[in-house]
Amino acid sequence: MPLNRFFSQCCFFLIAGFSAAQSVPNSSSLVLEEIMKGNEFIGHQPENIRWSIDGKKIYFDWNPKNEPGNSTYEFEPALKGSKPILSDPKTILEYDQTQSSYSDQYQIIGGSLTRYDKNSNQFTRIYSTTSDLHSIQRSNDPKTVYFQSGSNIFAYNRGLGNILQLTDFRSGEGSEKKSDSTYLMKQQTELFEFIRDQNERTAWRKSKEIKLFRDVTPFYIGKDQIEQIQVSPNGRFVSFRLSDYPNSAETKVEHHISSKGYTYSSNARAKVGEEEPTHRLGILNMEKDTVYFVDLSKLTDIRKKPEYLNDTLPYSNDRKVVMHSLKFNKSSDQAVCDIRSYDNKDRWIILIDLITGNFTEIERQHDEAWIGGPGISGWNTEEGTLGWLNDNQTVYFQSEKTGYSHIYLYQTSPLIKTIQRTTAFTEGSWEIYNVSLSKDGKYFYVNANRSHLGNRDFLKMEIASRKIFPVMSNEGYHDVSLSPDEKTLAIRFSDKNTPWELYTAVNTANATKTRITYSTTKQFNAYQWRKPEVITFKGSDGKDVYARLYQPQIAQKNTAAVIFVHGAGYLQNAHNYWSNYYREFMFHNLLVDNGFTVLDIDYRASEGYGRDYRTAIYRHMGGRDLQDHLDGKDYLVSLGIDSNRIGIYGGSYGGFITLMAMLSTPGEFPCGAALRSVTDWAHYNHEYTSNILNYPDTDPEAYRKSSPIYFADNLQGKLVMLHGMVDDNVQFQDVVRLSQRFIELHKTNWDLAVFPVEAHGFRESYSWNDE
């Protein structure tokens, strides 16, 4: 069935009930083909805001002329009458906040190590090579800077003007036999005085040689990959991670449209259940020229099994873990490290004595669902908030200990031994995002949803007094980049119906913004975009559920409604700023113009509402999250909507929920549209799925009750499925397998629309329009 006809049928069913379908006229001034062009219709907004080294310019990526891609623009806030202009790539020197305490800044530019003197504004090229230079690290000695070439560390000393190689990590096992260890060589030495005399003279000469420089001893890493190579600020230690990655079976994505006229395959991610990698944390003592590996077998409950296994006996071996990069103490031979278990149940923060390798466990976070939350991260390999205050005695990190993600402080050397070492720095039923320290170390700068769970305030927090100063806390999202002197804010701001624009403000409490960019097009500005109301309704378990509500004027209301389901699961969309689902936002305005009510729900598993909200789908996706949509349907009925005229649609996780609504609760919705949907979680990726459903071989029931394909026989309402054929995330195989089930079950009230050139995130406006 053609898609436009199917859409017309769905609209007609919602408007007039299940009689013969007919074309539904569009009563809106919005044209679907135009709004599906996305930012070409809206206007391309500024992004990637950053400052120049000298703090005089704000750089940002922008495309005001609707070119094929973004270009770098600059704006000088101190220059009266200044307007954004296109930057000369040769003159761009970006500020690096990690080097803010130094009088100079080093960068890798075009394969060269460069230095910028902040006092004289002089720019110098230090070292050029065809080798790959990367990963600049600063030393306690301001004249020394470390950088990597390949897998090894080098040091540049500005005072001496030299570059020294500090490490020599090599693949393989090294030479297994010494050059003098063969039988024949031993025999020669044993039989002939001439050979013995030669060896003696050679040894004597070597003993008299004066070595001006220490040789760099090779360290062989075997078949492992070496990662996260770091130098301690005092230069005494180098840390690194050796990783053994299993050869997991990759999936294939077939491409049917190509320039040569032939199909071809590309590799894609493995499926859930793959073998976990093995990691080791190594420490190289530069003075002793020795390497040891930190023994993590003493981590609390390292062999404990999760509760879902119903087995109280510990594992016979340690659980596999992944360690993040070290955060070195600048005044001692200590470092803190964030370690995660690969089964997603535990997080340990340890304080390591770099001399001995002994460690103290300063924080252990355990969650029988999975570790996650803002500043913590539910992805094992993604780093969370962790660092040292300027006193070099206090570690800061984030934890969901109270049910919401907040900042905590740990005293490594408390003045009073009986004092509680770990204390909460912030608290409340709201969450912290994007933590950074001020240059003087006296303040935290953070984003938070303190004023409203749908806002992102920009707050300044005094560490000594724990006072909170709202810098930007009005409705919307304040994405702030601080100038090098921290006196000026470059702000990327949006609200519910106003896309992102660049503003500036003075760094004071409740500052006033000055707008710099005007990005939206005449076509976008010609329409009066609604500000959807952010509301709450009660879930059937008594909990508040947040949602965006779009309502037509009473005279236009047709008592039919559409429920939109956002993707990702852990994502917030019922907020007070510009949505990542901007096409859907515009589509919802079009629907409201046509008399529909639209409800966009932040169902259980969504971001911004704390730990219990985040983990409510553990071991059952399509359970509590789907129930929130059924409760949302009841809420719509309370507004006068006909319960038989409510449709549901969404993409990715939203498509999955749509399928579960149509298949596991048949009869609840007369029609649904499922876009790029997961149909069987055993076929999705490992990192995301294992957090929530564990592993298919250890928790098969969680996978069965969470996968729409097992409920295919229940289909009653009208269903359309839409999927990109080169989707390397939720792969095309998902919708093909469910289609085969429908065919075998003799289901007829479904349609499949495929998009041959589209991946998970559609790129072409004609595909969006057709979808």
Which stretches of residues belong to each language-model region?
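Bacterial N-terminal signal peptides that target proteins for export
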Residues: M1-C10
